[in-house]
């Protein structure tokens, strides 16, 4: 019971050490990834992993829950305070599980769901045909304007009036602009639909007051905790009190069994951090960094190489890059940046002609680097490395760019001293 991981399972210990090295020495720019604080890692690696706690605080189906009840209540209260919500459920294991529970609570199988088309930046759980949301419900979709790549709310309204959905989802996985939540609310009211906002990507910006909050407009709001919120991988739900009973029942027993109390403890810690001035400063640097990258990728030397930025910029933490006129496709561009020490993900652009495993675009995010401490100076350097790689293509001097990326990474140490307290230690 007391032997360290390196002794019990040296194979896993070695892989953890290698992954720590990768995270330290490269620039993480996948928009949905971040670095959980040490305090969150400690909470999630705690003895709470041993505790079963089916039910809600004060209404458990197991004994011995006096301490985990307090943990969950702290997490719920912090979520409500942070987002100005009437109720919170912090038990969903993920953002996808949160969406499943909300739809379970608000709809019945066969009823109509309207969401952003996956090909235009939507998420799998917003009606993709192979996902549960595409199998259980009848789906309609809205998209972006082919010319501006922006969501046209008049078009959304026209679609909603024709389709008459039971639930409208406002949210995205790859859309670089702020949504008009008031307009979505108006449309939902006009057609008699409930409004679910999926703020998984921009919840941290909302918490910092740097992005409009969907909470006053939505019936229910779902989110992850690990993207811009910067906690551990998990989900939560906030919203109006009138939906609390239905959503609590949809989470348990509708979708899940026992909650992961160690993960809920990590959520509580992350939510406490998200209420601090330091967190707000990190979100400001996240936004500024994304704008710096977008501006650099729209410069003439990059545009000449056939690279463009979807919608002509960004309002959030990510930049969506269009490579349709470039010699590079999304896979090739992802691989090239990987070689120079920058991790991004290939991503479809609106109405992408290439298959999903190749794509014609990149999604580039700034949250993880802002968490490391990057500011405008560092983001300007990162932007130039990316721009040089994409504009030059396969003939670029990979070694020179990798040296620049590595110097940046090592200037901002990540998890300094982690080996001394973690199970990875030798």
Swiss-Prot record:
One of its GO terms (biological process) is glycine biosynthetic process from serine. Gene3D superfamilies: Aspartate Aminotransferase, domain 1, Type I PLP-dependent aspartate aminotransferase-like (Major domain). Pfam families: SHMT (PF00464). SUPFAM superfamilies: PLP-dependent transferases (SSF53383). (6S)-5,6,7,8-tetrahydrofolate binds at residues 118, 122-124. It comes from the Bacteria. It catalyses: (6R)-5,10-methylene-5,6,7,8-tetrahydrofolate + glycine + H2O = (6S)-5,6,7,8-tetrahydrofolate + L-serine. Its EC number is 2.1.2.1. Homodimer. Catalyzes the reversible interconversion of serine and glycine with tetrahydrofolate (THF) serving as the one-carbon carrier. This reaction serves as the major source of one-carbon groups required for the biosynthesis of purines, thymidylate, methionine, and other important biomolecules. Also exhibits THF-independent aldolase activity toward beta-hydroxyamino acids, producing glycine and aldehydes, via a retro-aldol mechanism. Belongs to the SHMT family. NCBIfam families: PRK00011.1. This is Serine hydroxymethyltransferase 1.
């Amino acid at each position: 019971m007391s032997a360290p991981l390196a002794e019990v399972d040296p194979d896993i210990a070695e892989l953890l050490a290698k992954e720590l090295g990768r995270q330290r020495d490269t620039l993480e720019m996948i928009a949905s990834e971040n670095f959980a604080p040490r305090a969150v890692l400690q909470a999630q690696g705690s003895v709470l992993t041993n505790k079963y706690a089916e039910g809600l605080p004060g209404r458990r189906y197991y004994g011995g829950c006096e301490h985990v009840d307090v943990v969950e209540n702290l997490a719920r209260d912090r979520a409500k305070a942070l987002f100005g919500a009437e109720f919170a459920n912090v038990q969903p294991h993920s953002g996808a599980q949160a969406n499943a529970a909300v739809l379970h609570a608000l709809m019945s199988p066969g009823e109509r769901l309207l969401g952003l088309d996956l090909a235009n930046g939507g998420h799998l759980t917003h009606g993709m045909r192979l996902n549960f949301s595409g199998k259980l419900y009848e789906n309609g979709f809205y998209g972006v304007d082919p010319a501006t790549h922006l969501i046209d709310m008049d078009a959304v309204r026209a679609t909603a009036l024709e389709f008459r959905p039971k639930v409208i989802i406002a949210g995205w996985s790859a859309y670089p602009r702020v949504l008009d939540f008031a307009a979505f609310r108006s449309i939902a009211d006009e057609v008699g639909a409930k409004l679910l906002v999926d703020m998984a990507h921009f919840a941290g910006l909302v918490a910092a007051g740097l992005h409009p909050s969907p909470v006053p407009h939505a019936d229910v709001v779902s989110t992850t905790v690990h993207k811009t919120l910067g906690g551990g991988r998990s989900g939560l739900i906030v919203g109006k009190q009138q939906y609390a009973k239905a959503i609590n029942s949809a989470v348990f027993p509708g979708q899940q069994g026992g909650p992961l109390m160690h993960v809920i403890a990590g959520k509580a810690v992350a939510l406490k951090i998200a209420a601090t001035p330091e967190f707000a400063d990190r979100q400001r640097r996240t936004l500024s960094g994304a704008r710096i990258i977008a501006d650099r990728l729209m410069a003439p030397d990059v545009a000449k190489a056939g690279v463009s930025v979807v919608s002509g910029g960004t309002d959030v933490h990510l930049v969506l890059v269009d490579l349709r006129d470039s010699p590079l496709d999304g896979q090739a561009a992802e691989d090239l940046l990987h070689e120079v020490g920058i991790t991004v993900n290939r991503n479809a652009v609106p109405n992408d002609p290439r298959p999903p495993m190749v794509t014609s675009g990149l999604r580039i995010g700034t949250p993880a680097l802002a968490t490391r401490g990057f500011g405008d100076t560092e983001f300007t350097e990162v932007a130039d490395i990316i721009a040089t790689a994409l504009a030059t293509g396969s003939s670029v001097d990979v070694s020179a760019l990798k040296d620049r990326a590595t110097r940046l990474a090592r200037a901002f140490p990540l998890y300094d001293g982690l080996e001394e307290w973690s199970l990875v230690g030798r």
